[in-house]
Amino acid sequence: MDAFKVIGGKPLRGDVVISGAKNAALPILMSALLSKTPVVFSNVPQLNDILTTVKLLGQLGAKTKWLNEEKLMIDASSIDVCRAPYDLVKTMRASILVLGPLLARMGHAEVSLPGGCAIGARPVNLHIQGLKLMGADITVEDGYIVAKKQGRLTGATIFMDTVSVTGTENLMMAAALAEGITIIENAAREPEIVDLANCLISMGAKITGAGTDTLTIEGVSELCGKEYSVMPDRIETGTFLVAAAVTQGHIKCLNTDPSSLEAVLSKLQEAGATITTGDDWIELEMSAPAKAVNVRTAPHPAFPTDMQAQFMTMNVLAEGTATVIETIFENRFMHVPELQRMGADIALEGNTAIVKGVASLNGAQVMATDLRASASLVIAGLVAKSPTQVDRIYHIDRGYLCIEGKLQSLGADITRIKVD
């Protein structure tokens, strides 16, 4: 098993190229199931979840081919399998995103109940309820969601009881091939939703309202994709910016989108960072310890839950006391005991963490528990007074493309090692 050995004390300096967004690429690759023609996707990061998705699409009968390290061709014109098996779905919760496209295209879908990070229930009932409103007959049998529909799905008005990114994505893809108009109310507004909508529109879908809480989809009889480029990863961008801030460094993130990170950039400025932006770059300079900043996660455009752990680490070393409130997922403070092992002063009260800044952290052997928690531990290691070993980094490999190589290019002392 791999681990990271991190030796702290070096400010991050230089330029870093941001990869394509995993959370945008996953639904976009699934959307190829809707297309009767081959689609070429660019800016696709070759992460474990992406490779699992490619394997899953192949098992459904799609032809896939990497044209270069970030360009992928998917031809789903002759898909002939409607079952997404447990052995693939168990490793990646986003596998549920084949449900809507398969049902809309084939009239039949069987998807194993999903796995992924252990950070809360993340129920799939919103997906099922929405598809039922569109006329699908859905049962759960032996751990599989079995969905059927004779003929095309039917447009419907769907109110999402809670804001769900994957729920919105699944229903939007299904509605693209439905008969009639579908309105999704209380829809997720994340930039990744907008990216998926733009991809579907490029295939011939009729979608309005992406980025607002009301989506309107006028179904069409077929979709034909050509080429589409995945948006930059806003969470990877934010992670590097926080790492630079914590190490009091000076970096420039290239191939990114400042407009997708407004809440994060605002909080970094509040912490004392100097930030400059262009159309596709963000520059951050930090010349003093961060000031403590309160954080409350909420659906976009508010502060993203996927940046909570990284900001927790920044607050651990900040001047003052901060509260970090997590409203999206339960069980998303699993990095706190690991940070405490390094000397952090954090008290938990339900979904709130009270963080009192300390002067320094000590290195320790710590364990990654989920994707973003692992990033927060790496950041802590970058400033610890003694070496840090981060175990179970397969979590971080699910969401960050060669993070150690990018950090090394910025001056960090981090190496991947083999452990028992």
UniProtKB/Swiss-Prot annotation:
Gene3D superfamilies: Enolpyruvate transferase domain (3.65.10.10). Keywords: Cell cycle, Cell division, Cell shape, Cell wall biogenesis/degradation, Cytoplasm, Peptidoglycan synthesis, Pyruvate, Transferase. The keyword Phosphoprotein does not apply. It catalyses: phosphoenolpyruvate + UDP-N-acetyl-alpha-D-glucosamine = UDP-N-acetyl-3-O-(1-carboxyvinyl)-alpha-D-glucosamine + phosphate. The active site is at C117 (proton donor). One of its GO terms (molecular function) is UDP-N-acetylglucosamine 1-carboxyvinyltransferase activity. Disulfide bonds: none annotated. The modification 2-(S-cysteinyl)pyruvic acid O-phosphothioketal is found at C117. Its EC number is 2.5.1.7. Phosphoenolpyruvate binds at K22, N23. The keyword Glycoprotein does not apply. One of its GO terms (biological process) is UDP-N-acetylgalactosamine biosynthetic process. Its main location: cytoplasm. It is found in: Cytoplasm. InterPro entries: Enolpyruvate_Tfrase_dom (IPR001986), Enolpyruvate_Tfrase_sf (IPR036968), MurA_subfamily (IPR050068), RNA3'P_cycl/enolpyr_Trfase_a/b (IPR013792), UDP_GlcNAc_COvinyl_MurA (IPR005750). Coiled coil: none annotated. GO terms for cellular component: cytoplasm. UDP-N-acetyl-alpha-D-glucosamine binds at R93, D306, I328. Pathway: Cell wall biogenesis; peptidoglycan biosynthesis. Cell wall formation. Adds enolpyruvyl to UDP-N-acetylglucosamine. HAMAP family: MurA. Belongs to the EPSP synthase family. MurA subfamily. This is UDP-N-acetylglucosamine 1-carboxyvinyltransferase. The gene is murA.
